[in-house]
Amino acid sequence: MKKDFLEKIRKLNWVLSESTTGKLSYGELCRILSEIINANIYVIDRNGFVLGAAYTEASDTSTFEDELGFEKITDSDNLSLLEIEATSANVIGDDLMYMFGKSYKMTDKYHTFVPSICGGERLGTILLAKYHKPFDEEEIVLAEYGAAVVGLEIQRNDRIKKEHEQNLKTAVEMAFCTLSHSEKDALDKILRETKEDEGNIVASKIAAKYGLTNSVIVSALKKLESAGILETKSLGMKGTYIKILNPHVRSLI
């Protein structure tokens, strides 16, 4: 195996090792792939969001950004990508117009599409594009290796998000268990008066409106604040500012 090819693999391995510590940047991954393959690189997740991009020619940046909006491609374009179940290399001309429509402006570039699949689940797509000459076998192998890195990272991020959501739910449940029946009732009324995730309340008005005591309302707020569920700030005569930090608190009321 060529020495330079091994060096390119090592660069991608470096990105993967950084990922395990939570430091991966999709932009950095795209930059490295763009550098070693000499092509424009786009990492797109399964929902059509552009996670990262890198360009060999600055003039290409705005063109593709205009067409994709950079942050998200159209649903129809994303569907076309998801229909690609295996690496599709060196697509050009009419085949690109068939995929993305006649208005697509880069039909003169060679495109390679590499699905990112991990654990049998489709997680995204790496799109590569360049002028002048088609992608060779080595470049396609590197792109497929990059797609594996992307799949592992997306899967890791999904797992972290799920764990974070579960931790939020658990925190709310534990905090809820510390409330007395009257404090739970007070919390229900507070949330009714706070339609958004933040706002101002006047404890005395809520107490009078629902037949509660100020002390019960204050106690409920203090317990939830100490549990990290919300934060409060006294506004003096204007009442109390409340900001909900854990959105799952509403699900238990």
Q: Which positions does each model-derived feature cover?
A:
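Juxtadomain coupling helices with adjacent low-complexity linkers
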Residues: 1-29, 68, 124, 130-177
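Structured interaction and signal-relay segments at domain junctions
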Residues: 2-14, 18-107
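Short coil/loop residues immediately preceding or within conserved phosphate-binding loops
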Residues: 38, 111, 239
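Acidic surface patches and DE-rich sequence motifs
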Residues: 45, 118, 235
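Sensory/regulatory domains in signal-transduction proteins
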Residues: 83-153, 157
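Signal-transducing coiled-coil/dimerization helices and immediately adjacent hinge/linker segments
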Residues: 156-247
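Short, amphipathic alpha-helical interaction segments positioned at domain boundaries
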Residues: 247-253
